[in-house]
Amino acid sequence: GISTREVVLKHKTGSEGIISVSTDLLDYTLQWADDAGVLQGTGAQSLSNDYFTVTKEDNGSRLVITALQNNLADGSNRIQHFVITAQRWTIYVSIQQKYDIAAYKTINLMSFTSGLGYLGTNILGSSSAEARATGLRGILTNQTNFGPDGVVECGGYNLVGVGVNANNLTDALFSLFDVVYINYVPTSQFGSQDAHKLHNWLKTKKNRVLIASYDASDVSQNLLAEILAGKSGIKYFTSNGGPYPLAASTIGNHYFTTDGPFTKNAPVTSNFALRNYDIYHGEIQVNTSASEGITPILMGPGGGIVLGIDYSRRIVYWGDTDMSSNLSGTGATSENHINNTAGTINNDASKLIANVFAWITETVLYGE
């Protein structure tokens, strides 16, 4: 048997669908068919046409269907059929690639006005970003990067600043946002009740993302206590021990250095290290309970995680507020930090950070 007879792909080139195949007859064949089920061509071990490929993986226990073109026609579905034949058994399968209006959704991102790293507001009542967020703000608001015709297709980013009011933030407020960034906000200003509501907001929908700062011992402690639930292993540094090198390359972090939309033509160099702006940052120590489920992207001089993602929980762990700054700081070069406020992607640092937000954007658009 197979897990599904209909595969629905996103509108983008490279969108994939998976069919699990349960059979002892792993030499089964594949053949294109028309809308009436009439076979076309001859049976084969893989299929390819102008729009889709169908290939076997894992000794035939999986079929991977991949879109070869974008479907950008409003209201249209691109449909193709194929047949699986295993001796006397035949199974008719349909592929649909839908135009996806979600791709043009505007992403609503909240950060907090009283904390370092505040991203500012770019809609009614526009306000500037705090100095440690000017580089990232430029990347997010430049529609060459994130926009209807951008590298990542979406409606763009609405950045909204909110004032903190310990234990008085509401569920209704959080519900307005797709992404919440708890920037460098003092622990006294973001209470345990706020943290609990934010955690519930995150768990309620699969297309919401939390960015959690852990830059110092006096910020985000109520949030960390909520999302890590008694786990330990975060260390806070108050001296500059050097830059933040890439974590060891794995399938889990390859997106940010190589496979993501901002690095497909020019990957991040393997010896890249992001500059460590000042003496303060936090690290989630590896092989501790706090690090469980987190894929490392950047490591700190203390051997812990400065930037990482928990994919299953949709949490980005952001250990240094200054990663989003365009200011030089300690040990800066033209390559090792975001070096402009216009959002120009012109070095390894900007490509890496842009890919992190590409993953965030795709999760908001296509999280299920």
Predicted regions and their residues:
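Surface-exposed binding patches on compact interaction domains or structured appendages
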Residues: G1-I2, I18-V64
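Aromatic-Pro/Gly-enriched surface loop or interdomain linker
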Residues: I101-V179, S324-S325, N340, A354, ...
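C-terminal edge beta-strand
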Residues: W89-I101
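A glycine-rich, often tryptophan-bearing local segment used as a flexible ligand/cofactor-contacting loop or short
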Residues: T134, P186-N276
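Short, solvent-exposed loop/linker segments at the N-terminal edge
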Residues: G1, E6-G14
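A short beta-strand micro-motif common to beta-rich folds, especially ectodomain repeats
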Residues: D74-R88
